[in-house]
Amino acid sequence: MMTFRFLQLIPPYSFRTLSFTFSRIAYLLVFVASFSIFYSCSTSRHASTITDYRALAKASRKLGVRIDYKDNHRLFLECAQWVGVPYRYGGKSRRGVDCSGLTYCIYRQLYGVSLSPNSQMQLDRDVQVRVKKGHVTPGDLLFFSDRRSKRHINHVGIYLKGGKFIHASTSRGVRIDDLQDAHWKKRWVAAGRTAGKRF
């Protein structure tokens, strides 16, 4: 009875005012919560961006190329991790790798493509599109031969940019070289792209 009498004493407009106040408080709480989530996500993205920039800057120095925002960052980051790995015939790991093993590992990681086990087969079986030397793009496979006829492929690498490519040298392991060097100009045979390569 006391509760009923108390409610009778409260004017009707007080309930409307109270309801309006609670609505404003609820709106304010939702706004604060949304801002907190947005700030948290923005901070996380900012930290991730800084980390990416640092990793790309390191990869750029290691590969000797300038990496732009439009480049395939995953390609350059992956290749940078292989520089300095020792040569090992038939190897397919960072403990040791040969030229076709290097292209196999990088393509499998980046494109989910399993290339053939040697450079000759990669050109004959895996390449779907031949590319002229002046039109190579980052990620294209490059093929070389030390034979006079150049019919037998015995070396393969991956093009980066600016004339640079990554490959596994028998004497110096995984390294970066320039296509304009006389040695590589003499050995050049072809370039190509596989069906699984994405830009």
Regions of interest found by a model, annotated:
Residues 5, 24-31:
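Sec-dependent signal peptide recognition
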Residues 42-51, 56-67, 130-133, 152-199:
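Aromatic- and glycine-rich peptidoglycan recognition patches
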Residues 1-22:
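N-terminal secretory signal peptides that target proteins for export/translocation
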Residues 62-66, 85-138, 189:
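Catalytic cysteine-centered active-site loop
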Residues 37-40:
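C-terminal motif of bacterial Sec signal peptides marking the signal peptidase cleavage site
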Residues 48, 54-95:
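Post-signal-peptide N-terminal segment of Sec-exported extracytoplasmic proteins
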